Curated annotation (Swiss-Prot):
EC number(s) given by UniProt: 7.3.2.1
Superkingdom field: Bacteria
Cellular component terms (Gene Ontology): plasma membrane
Name this polypeptide is given: Phosphate import ATP-binding protein PstB 2
Bilayer topology annotation: Peripheral membrane protein
């Protein structure tokens, strides 16, 4: 079972907005996003620490998934979407005109709400991104498959059926396969958009344990509507409401002694 008291020794609890560049994975400055005339995000300012799990929480429609999708520019695919401000990934401005979007998305992997394996074998799902990069050597691909599936805690369950269709896996196994597919290309950041909302409690626990393990190698940002889950898996938590960042800090502090009444009301179920 994973520990609920992660090592946060390099930060004091409320220093999250004063991180050094060295400890910062993602720096968001004055980020505003509009869909047409509708404001979805307003003046978001935050630094996300590397090698930690950061959770975005908030009521439905608050902007948390929109913010998550800004980190790998998925919102570029939305018509009439306008973005102002900046996001830096390890110092690189991802909204700079010269940014290569495919390269960015190799650096920032993403897993969505419902498992979405490709209609291919388990093996081909994992190597899909590697093949796109031009990697063809069988030995390299085989090693990458084993490493990614082990990292996703799936190897022992599928090692004898790698060439079977991925649709034959359970929902929880499919989601772990999707995570393996994302990490096979070795991203720096892994974005998880409500990754357990379509899963049963046992599969949810398995994914939560996996998230805790993944932070040893990746910076993880998760959107979840489940506050108990955010409290269990995150080192830092951001409460977002009506497109604004209300409060952001150490997860234990957010869930036990939040500064803002709005945060307290949401966490205690008085609204939202």
């Amino acid at each position: 079972m994973y520990s609920l008291s992660p090592d946060l020794s390099f930060l004091s609890p409320m220093d999250v907005n004063h991180l050094s560049d060295e400890n910062t994975a993602i720096e968001i400055n004055n980020l505003c996003l509009n869909y047409g005339k509708t404001s979805a995000l307003s003046n978001i300012e935050m630094r996300i620490p590397k090698g930690q799990v950061t959770a975005f929480i908030g009521p439905s429609g608050c902007g948390k998934s929109t913010l998550l999708r800004c980190i790998n520019r998925m919102n570029d695919l939305v018509d009439n979407c306008k973005i102002k401000g900046s996001i830096k990934l390890f110092g690189d401005d991802i909204y700079h005109p010269d940014t290569d979007i495919p390269s960015l998305r190799r650096r920032v992997g993403m897993v969505f709400q419902r498992p979405n394996p490709f209609p291919k074998s388990i093996y081909e799902n994992v190597v899909y991104g590697l093949r796109l990069q031009g990697i063809k050597e069988a030995r390299v691909l085989d090693e990458a498959v084993e490493e990614a599936l082990k990292a996703a805690a799936l190897w022992d369950e599928v090692k004898h059926r790698l060439h079977e269709n991925a649709f034959g896996l359970s929902g929880g196994q499919q989601q772990r396969l999707v995570i393996a597919r994302a990490i096979a290309i070795e991203p720096e950041v892994l974005l998880l958009d409500e990754p357990t909302s379509a899963l049963d409690p046992i599969s949810t626990l398995t994914i939560e344990e996996l998230i805790y393990e993944l932070k040893s190698k990746y910076t993880v940002v998760i959107v979840t509507h489940n506050m108990q889950q955010a409290a269990r898996v995150s080192d830092y938590t951001a409460f977002i409401n009506q497109g604004k960042l209300v409060e952001y800090g150490n997860a234990n502090t957010i869930f036990t002694s939040p500064i803002h009444k709005q945060t307290e009301d949401y966490i205690t179920g008085r609204y939202g």
